[in-house]
Amino acid sequence: MEKFTTLTGVAAPLDAANVDTDQIIPKQFLLAVDRKGFGVHLFHERRYLDDAETIENPDFVLNKPAYRSASILVARRNFGNGSSREHAPWTLLDFGIAPSFADIFSNNALGNGLVLVKLAEEEVDELFRILEADPGMKVTVDLVTMTCTAGERTWRFTLDPFRRKCLLEGFDAVSLTLEHEDDIRAREKREPAWLVPHVEDLKSCPV
């Protein structure tokens, strides 16, 4: 997972609450397990007028010229509710700013390096007004200072310290485990053999 400190990019205002994971990436596109190639299907039902994805919906925010290069998505409350699917953060994998996120989506997103910035409802309302007054405006998200800035306005946000550390240092579940491999092996040696089998023993076990 790549390290993250700051991002400055065009912010697209998706003025909708309760956007579920099926809207983010519909179930018919979940067959692949490679993380790449999902972006074209992002918001399939909203973004296209046909199933073949050849006719764009000109009214959808990401299809408007000012937001085609957007790397930040600003949404309303309860973004990412619905079924648990890692394909949703894979499909977005840039940024989301909203008053609240569904718990399962939040865990999947942060585990895949997708930073979720949660602001108060009134702060998100203000951010929407700023973006709507200046389409294509760039917003800066700074994980070091825990701030989000649009024009002359800056808001502070919070994030679980452990999650923040993982994002800043580029740790996912695997790399974080490997970082403590020596400690894990030392713990294994202190435990009874019948309680914690060693990795080498597991490799030799018949299936």
Residue ranges and their predicted role:
Residues N18-V19, F79-G80, F162:
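Short, glycine-/Ser/Thr-/acidic-enriched flexible segments
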Residues L31-K138, L143:
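Feature captures the catalytic cores and cofactor-binding loops of soluble hydro-lyases/lyases
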Residues M1-A32, D172-V207:
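N-terminal, positively charged, Ser/Thr/Ala/Gly-biased leader segments
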Residues L114-K203:
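Acidic, glycine-rich flexible loop/linker segments
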Residues I25, S106-G111, G151-R153:
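Short acidic, glycine/serine/threonine-rich loops at helix termini
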